[in-house]
Curated annotation (Swiss-Prot):
Function: Catalyzes the synthesis of the hydroxymethylpyrimidine phosphate (HMP-P) moiety of thiamine from aminoimidazole ribotide (AIR) in a radical S-adenosyl-L-methionine (SAM)-dependent reaction.
Matches recorded under Pfam families: ThiC_Rad_SAM (PF01964)
Alphabetic keyword roster: 4Fe-4S, Iron, Iron-sulfur, Lyase, Metal-binding, S-adenosyl-L-methionine, Thiamine biosynthesis, Zinc
Residues holding Zn(2+): 279, 370
Family affiliation: Belongs to the ThiC family.
The record's free-text note on cofactor binding: Binds 1 [4Fe-4S] cluster per subunit. The cluster is coordinated with 3 cysteines and an exchangeable S-adenosyl-L-methionine.
Chain residues that bind substrate: 80, 109, 139, 175, 195-197, 236-239, 275, 329
Binding site for [4Fe-4S] cluster: 450, 453, 458
Reported cofactor(s): [4Fe-4S] cluster
Entry protein name: Phosphomethylpyrimidine synthase
HAMAP family: ThiC (MF_00089)
Pathway linked to the protein: Cofactor biosynthesis; thiamine diphosphate biosynthesis
Length: 486
């Protein structure tokens, strides 16, 4: 689909959507996104130009169906897949991709660390994927030196980053925000550093006593991303791994650096989103979203004494010609740490709140989080939990049309249209399965009850006649008149 679109850009030094957006050009990708989101194409262009929205669309991912991530659009959900050294292969990973898309993933990240040839796995995933694919290049960098992190050089990192870009990866998590001076700040934490990529960079810095090479070579990464229109997903290496560690000095120090890197990328017209925590108590979620918005804008919003969550925030930001804030992309956050096996629930609670406050994309968490590699059923449960969270956030933010499907399903429920209820469900197969568990015969698909209330006690059988309501209103009016006169 995109081959002809991309051919027109041949020879351009910067092919990013942000670059074209700032020139006033509405790209084919922007038009496609506008139709998907039911938003004006000019709004999409303006949001991308300001850095408030990204369209992750590598020029080498030609079978991509473009989508957007930003506060002006629907809240999105990412699913993680990937082979490990002990399990999985190419076929299994492509199957996981298809399953993720089936259950509503808007983007998919390939987090493979082993299980075969990583380049072949990634290529197969990209070739099979109509949704954007993200990666964490430091994983393959470590694999290339057989796990000897101390042997990695800046060139090793850059080589892998460019390879991923050439293959068609749409966004890459770059752990450039963790600095050597941040490392002592984790001393008081219970869980230390829980980001795999962040842990790799931390070990490298501790061994060499040198600054993070992804930070010192950030401009080189920008040049790579310009050529292929790869979006930055700035990794939060110091995200909290438990509620005790949330919003601490280490996390906020890195966030400030991520804001600086965001502005540097924008200076070269490269797209950016910023990753966030993690494990956060409910009372700190609003603070975390607000803090990211403040830091990852140009200029930083706290310098303007501007509240990004105020009802007139967008109007004020336009008044001061503010760029951003960059889209926020959070993992969860989990609001409690005591429910292993149920962390798709503990995190979906936090995800719904984060989305309501303005987070643009939610990274799903499966029931296997902290316990093991998820299987197909775990992926399904995690994705549905997060589709619920994202949809609830859209309703809470009063996005245009967000509640239409809810209203349609409610009408079908009231009319006992069981098949229509199943069709409108986020997981039609599960809804039908639960209904048919006790009432499997086809005749019950038109029955005016389910097995909860049975045929005699369902309150929705009480259909209030319009004429009866009119008569009742007349009666109540007369009663009120009598009371008034007395």
């Amino acid at each position: 689909m995109r081959t002809e679109w991309i051919a027109k850009r041949s020879g351009h030094k910067n092919v990013s959507q942000m670059h074209y957006g700032r020139q006033g050009i509405i790209t084919e990708e922007m038009n496609f996104v506008a139709q998907r989101e039911n938003l004006p194409a000019e709004l999409i262009r303006a949001e991308v130009a300001r850095g408030r929205m990204i369209i992750p669309a590598n020029i080498n991912h030609t079978n991509l169906e473009p989508m957007c991530i930003g506060i002006a659009s629907r809240c999105k959900v990412n699913a993680n897949i990937g082979a490990s050294p002990n399990t999985s292969d190419i076929t299994k990973e492509v199957d996981k991709l298809k399953l993720s898309i089936k259950y509503g993933a808007d983007t998919v990240m390939d987090l493979s660390t082993g299980g075969g040839n990583l380049d072949e796995i990634r290529t197969a995933i990209i070739n099979a994927s109509p949704v954007p694919i993200g990666t964490v290049p430091v994983y393959q960098a470590v694999e290339s030196v057989h796990g000897r992190i101390e042997n990695l050089t800046a060139d090793d990192f850059l080589h892998v980053i460019e390879k991923h870009a050439q293959q068609g990866v749409d966004y890459q998590t770059i752990h450039a925000g963790i600095l050597i001076e941040h490392l002592p700040l984790v001393r008081s934490r219970i869980t230390g550093i829980v980001s795999r990529g962040g842990g790799i960079i931390a070990k490298w810095m501790l061994h060499h006593h040198k600054q993070n090479p992804l930070y010192t070579h950030f401009d080189d990464i920008i040049e790579i991303f310009k050529k292929y229109d790869v979006s930055f997903s700035l990794g939060d290496s110091l995200r909290p791994g438990c509620t005790h560690d949330a919003s601490d000095e280490a996390q906020l120090a890195e966030l400030k650096t991520l804001g600086q890197l965001t502005r540097r990328a924008w200076g070269h017209e490269v797209q950016v989103m910023v990753e966030g925590p993690g494990h956060v108590p409910m009372d700190q979620i609003e603070f975390n979203v607000k803090k990211q918005m403040e830091e990852c804008s140009s200029p930083p919003l706290n310098a303007l004494d501007l509240d990004p969550l105020a009802s007139n925030a967008n109007e004020q930001m336009e008044k001061f010609n503010v760029l951003g804030p960059a889209p926020f992309y959070v993992l969860g956050p989990l609001v409690t740490d005591i429910a292993p096996g149920y962390d798709h629930i503990t995190s979906a609670i936090g995800a719904a709140m984060a989305g309501w406050y303005g987070t643009a994309m939610l990274c799903y968490v499966t029931p296997k989080e902290h316990l093991g590699l998820p299987n197909a059923e775990d992926v399904r449960n995690g994705l549905i939990a997060y589709k619920i969270a994202a949809h609830a956030a859209d309703i809470g933010r009063h996005r245009q049309g967000a509640r239409d499907r809810d209203d349609e399903l409610s009408a079908a429920r009231y009319n006992f249209d069981w098949n229509r209820q199943f069709e409108l469900s986020l997981d039609p197969e599960r809804a039908k399965e639960y209904h048919d568990e006790t009432l499997p015969a086809d005749i019950y698909k038109t029955a005016e009850f389910c097995s909860m209330c049975g045929p005699k006690f369902c309150p929705m059988q009480t259909k209030v006649d319009a004429d009866a309501l009119t008569e009742l209103e007349k009666f109540l009016a007369k009663e009120k008149e009598v009371v008034t006169q007395s």
